[in-house]
Amino acid sequence: MAADIRRKKLHPDGKVTYLVDRNVNYTNVCTINCQFCSFYRPPGHDETYTQSFEEISQRINELEDIGGSRILMQGGVNPDLEFSWYLDLISYLVKNHPDIHLDCFSPIEIEGIAEVSGMTTLEAVSYTHLTLPTKVE
């Protein structure tokens, strides 16, 4: 209700907008064991998966086909994925889907990625912020 009141103040003409987005779960392998998560599988479980870059890209193609503009990409803390895998994934997605806004990785994932890679969380975030492309030049 408060959001509707604010919208009416900002847009008295009655304009309403929305985003078409999609959640993409790139892996369900995780070592964290969060109490609220029924999605994860521990390493070695026979129901684990990690999608290839091409599989993730196909999910984004499906979003683009319906006019979508953003993905939320999350998974687990997969100890088999090196830091470079995440960098390569983001670079691949930016190159192949330049018009899609990428909203990737939860704080716990970033902490886990850093730990698996022998980095501090600050180093991991700083490195990705400074080196990853945000759009194709």
Pin down the residues of each PLM region:
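Canonical radical SAM enzyme core domain
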Residues: 44-57, 78-92, 96-127
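Glycine-rich beta-strand-to-loop/alpha-helix junction loops that act as flexible
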Residues: 74-76
